[in-house]
Amino acid sequence: MVTIKSKREIELMREACRVTALTHKAIEEAIKPGMTTADIDRIAEQTMKKYGAISAEKGYDPGIRGVPPYPASTCISINDEVIHGVPSNKRIIKDGDIVSVDLVALKNGYNGDAARTYMVGNVSKDAKRLVEVTKQAFFEGIKYAKKGNRIGDISHAIGEYVRTQGYSVVREFQGHGIGKEMHEDPGIPNYGKAGKGIRLEPGMTLAIEPMVIQGKPDILELEDGWTIITEDGSLAAHYENTILITEKEPEVLTIL
């Protein structure tokens, strides 16, 4: 069921989303070659704590037999890893890596979700273009995140923009509603038909998240039960924000 947030709930969402944005700011300022993904995870956890929040991801139970609850405060995915990479003291970030960090701050019972792909050191032109296209895909999508439009309008805009740039969108994972729960209705694919899906109403809070692959759209899951990689080894990028549907233009809650 899609939830329409009250004025009070929207204020609580803004608070949680501000923590998410501040946490990404701390990561952006700190990330460099030689750090481990666990180092980044610790920075995120400490920053969320500083602002009165906790990670909604840590301890998350996917409800899949044999897959343990998620062990970290962030998902950190490097190069050909698309999403859900598990931070590790053994995983060292190198010059030229693109590093996707997805995090959800939980504060006062509400969630703020955002992902960024960070370019570390001397990144190739191809990698830089992928990251830039992925970010722009988000902004192409939210042009249609307006009262009276439909979910499919957002999905179509993202998918078509990515296609025209010569890349592929991930089809098995998607954006989602967000609020008291990290994942709420509706699902928001990164491809689809304009004019389809539920109508957008003021008070909806949505996590829009293009996940873009340089090569073919096929993906694989690693044995850890979490990490998703590209099947062909090509690079992947991820850009996400939590937005609010209003009477006019959408409000992006996870950008400072």
Regions found by a protein language model. Name each.
Residues 1-256:
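Active-site neighborhoods and metal-handling regions in enzymes and metal-associated proteins
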